[in-house]
Amino acid sequence: MSALNVPDSRQFILKEKDAQNIGEWIILPFQTEHDAKEPLGFMIQRHNERLLFITDSYFVRYKFKNINYLMIECNYSADILEENVINKVIHQVQKKRVLQSHFSLENVKEFLNANDLSQLREIHLLHISERNGDPERFKKEIQAMTGVPVYV
C-alpha cells in the first residue's frame, strides 16, 4: 500500500524505454532533459490514437511519428526572458536555471519542425511561465506554424 492508499497491485513503476500496458493503454516513457533526477516524457497509446506528453524538459532527443495529440511545455520565450533579466525582473542565476530546465517557445518550434505532424489533431501548451511567457502569443505562433488547434 502506498502513502496515497493505492494498493500495490494498482501501482506501476515506469522506466525509460520500457513500455507498460495499463488496461487498454500502452505507456512508453522516454528520457527528457531537465535538472531533476530521471526526467521522463510519455508516449501514451490507446487503440490507434497517440498522445505525446512532455513537460519539465528543455530538449527531447527523439523524433516521433503518428502523434494525434501533443501536450508540451512551452515555458518561456528567449526575448521575454532576456528582457526580464535586463529589467531585473529575474536574476541571472534564475535565467540559467530556466534555460537548463524548461522548454522555450523557440525549442518547441524546433521540436515540431523535427517531427512528423501529419496525424496531429491538437496541441496543448503546458507550464507557461507567468513572468517569462505569453500564452496568447505562444498559442498564435504555434497554431500558425502547425495549422492545428492549440490550447493553453
Language model: regions and residue ranges:
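Long hydrophobic alpha-helices with heptad-repeat/coiled-coil character
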Residues: 1, 51-53, 146-148
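Active-site HxH/HxHxD metal-binding segment of metal-dependent hydrolases
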Residues: 1-20
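Short, well-ordered coil/turn elements that cap or connect secondary structure elements
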Residues: 6-8, 22-24, 48, 117-118, ...
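Generic structural signal for short, flexible, solvent-exposed coil/loop and linker residues
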Residues: 9-11, 21, 31-33, 92, ...
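Core dinuclear metal-dependent hydrolase active-site scaffold
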Residues: 14-69
